[in-house]
């Protein structure tokens, strides 16, 4: 302000915001003239917004349409690294969509969410089994106008990574972790038709090298026994059971320790 003359400077995302600001200042008692040096923010189409998490640290990138939205997004993730910039071109519903994306990010311990206008992509690793299940139904809860275009989620890490199979002579029960849902089908298919196989497997990341091949080979050898149990804990394998004779015992032992 120079005497009774005011000059507005800064950046706005719409011409309407500039007109409104000029009108507000002009209505101030004692102000005679108002000059606007406010610049329009760069227009971005599509309008980008992204958030990522790594080693517990969240980073926000892309654009925000107003300082109000900027503050709201930072408040939603306290301590986030802010690399966002003020830009124009945000679609209607941007803030609600961004909050929805940040809520999804809270279910990840590694990965990110990204918007192109109101189209959302999510990729990463779930922080828990419950979070993994929650993310699978994300599109059903999306705000009006938001499209979940891609959802690539890995299950949470299991440590130790465990798996076990028990054969009682007539049926097999399998429990523990699995890197994918297809493994249960492969295990059931590996048993003879007259040996029912029940599986209670939890999806998890962190499987040791060769895990899937090992489970199939171990099940094959377990079924050579009259009864027994085999277990994997990370890279350690344990097998005990009752073989029909010394020849079977030697063959199974050699196969498991190879």
Regions found by a protein language model. Give the residues of each.
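N-terminal targeting leaders
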Residues: 1-258
